[in-house]
Amino acid sequence: MSTAANEPSRSRGKAPAGERVADWADGRLGIYSLAKANMRKIFPDHWSFMLGEVCLYSFIIIILTGVYLTLFFHPSMAEVEYHGSYVPLQGQMMSEAYASTLDISFDVRGGLLIRQIHHWAALIFLAGMFVHMMRVFFTGAFRKPREVNWLFGFLLLVLGMFTGFTGYSLPDDLLSGTGIRFMEGAILSVPIVGTYISFFLFGGEFPGHDFVSRFYSIHILLLPGIMLGLLVGHLILVFYHKHTQFAGPGKTNKNVVGMPLLPVYTAKAGGFFFLVFGVISVVSAIATINPIWAIGPYRPDQVSTGAQPDWYMGFSEGLIRVMPGWEINAWGHTLVLGVFVPLLIFPLVLAAIAVYPFIESWVTGDKREHHILDRPRNAPTRTAFGVAWLTVYFVLLIGGGNDLWATHFHLSINAITWFVRIAFFVGPVVAFIATKRICLGLQRRDKDKVLHGRESGIIKRLPHGEFIEVHEPLSQEQLHTLTAHEQYQPAEIGPTVDENGVERKVSGTQKLRAKLSESYYGEESQIPKPTVEEYKEITSGHGHH
Ligand code: HEM
Ligand code: HEM
């Protein structure tokens, strides 16, 4: 609200310049009320809440460096003869895109560093999103009311992957061209429409003369534009929902305990931005990434050895590499299952992320809002699902780099391929079972700690000769944190025969839901929390050390 016009301070002379600018802006944008409502917004403190910030800052760094690259990059596949300062490629024929990337690397001031920062920031951005997503998943921060924000995040992840892929393809070097060839193969395996899509995308026969300029618009405009919109929406929703917090004394589902946005959080966040920028710059200055001059220009009849996509695309590469080369030939057509099946599984691996919050809320039937985070051990089935998914992902990542594993560790490539084929099915099951057991073990340990205190490491000898370890009682805060979680009862189908003896039909989905609910909250899936009576009984000193 602007009150400058009728303020008595006028009589004391002109207000300071800053205040006048603020008044001017307030009259047009209403910033006072906006700031009043949001400046004291509270953010809880936990190291894992910095992961979203890492994504944000690396995205900003990508945009800043990307703009610089656009000043010198020529998105054209026209053939030129190279006459830049990199001697080994002098006189070679190559696309303008490749030649301009060489120029960025050798002839543009600061060009190589900016290219390196752009590429490293992209890798860290995707890694940041991946780990941030894991933080959100394992703590249950995707539950109501944050499911939509989870979907926004999911879209950011998928779009980030494709933005990275299109960027990787721009320099038109032998490695990026091989990646595009891989994509063309996958598109061609789609029955009926595959050839049409490929011709449409490449403007004719692969590789054609168009894909760099097309990918360029997609890379610098379309995808980052959509991502920017989603990102703003994502952050507005984080603001609107307020941040979740871990259980602790004084923290409830209705409050947020932490630091105010201004000045504390803003100062911390500003500092953290420079830290992220600094680390990415140092890494980029030390570790070469994508030395396109050593890889050479793209020629469709050549493939470089050890060809690898960037890490976030590795799992899709793994799917293709380990799939048996099955084919069906019928009516003069070939269905290449060896490529088409991986192409179908690829979106399924990703879709599992998108749908999980909705599946969990359906199974648990929980319609309440959740602002207090779970400790992963207290949600064993969810944690086990997460680890099973990660297992599939990392097993496929091994498959994607099977040649590198083979050469670096002197292993047989066939043995690795078979390992991945078997582990793709067995790995997640073993991971699920093991994770659940570990979670339950940790729950038991928590219970033990609450009832008997912390093992102090001090061994005492009693007068009659027995050795015991002295247990120290936990503080009230620790007790609160270890016992704050809710424990649900599994949803039951209820009696199938009513009081009049009429049988009720139970549908398959109801049965499935009850079974899954049992897996989430049944006796096998949670260790009952210690009750107040149990605690009192034990701590009152009857029969315990
Ligand atoms: C461009 C990428 C992304 C950026 C810049 C970003 C940024 C952020 C920031 C700054 C926060 C608050 C701090 C924190 O909890 O870390 C946050 C929270 C959140 N993010 Fe992201 N995020 C991104 C991607 C994702 C992805 C991939 C997912 C999941 C699939 C996701 C889901 C969420 C959810 C559900 C919250 C609310 C968490 C809570 O209140 O505890 N985000 N995000
Ligand atoms: C999430 C967003 C983005 C990701 C993940 C990403 C990733 C990449 C990657 C991995 C490369 C290959 C770099 C190399 O040569 O080794 C690249 C190239 C490039 N990117 Fe991006 N980028 C993103 C956004 C942008 C934006 C917003 C712009 C421009 C405003 C941009 C402009 C460029 C240009 C001009 C190139 C080609 C030059 C070169 O390869 O050095 N990028 N990008």
UniProtKB/Swiss-Prot annotation:
Its cofactor is heme. The keyword Phosphoprotein does not apply. Keywords: Cell membrane, Electron transport, Heme, Iron, Membrane, Metal-binding, Respiratory chain, Translocase, Transmembrane, Transmembrane helix, Transport. Its EC number is 7.1.1.8. One of its GO terms (molecular function) is ubiquinol-cytochrome-c reductase activity. GO terms for cellular component: membrane; plasma membrane. It is an enzyme of class 7 (translocase). Heme 1 binds at residues 118, 219. It is found in: Cell membrane. Binds 2 heme groups non-covalently per subunit. It is a multi-pass membrane protein. The cytochrome bc1 complex is composed of a cytochrome b (QcrB), the Rieske iron-sulfur protein (QcrA) and a diheme cytochrome c (QcrC) subunit. Belongs to the cytochrome b family. Cytochrome b subunit of the cytochrome bc1 complex, an essential component of the respiratory electron transport chain required for ATP synthesis. The bc1 complex catalyzes the oxidation of ubiquinol and the reduction of cytochrome c in the respiratory chain. The bc1 complex operates through a Q-cycle mechanism that couples electron transfer to generation of the proton gradient that drives ATP synthesis. The cytochrome b subunit contains two ubiquinol reactive sites: the oxidation (QP) site and the reduction (QN) site. This is Cytochrome bc1 complex cytochrome b subunit. It comes from Streptomyces coelicolor (strain ATCC BAA-471 / A3(2) / M145).
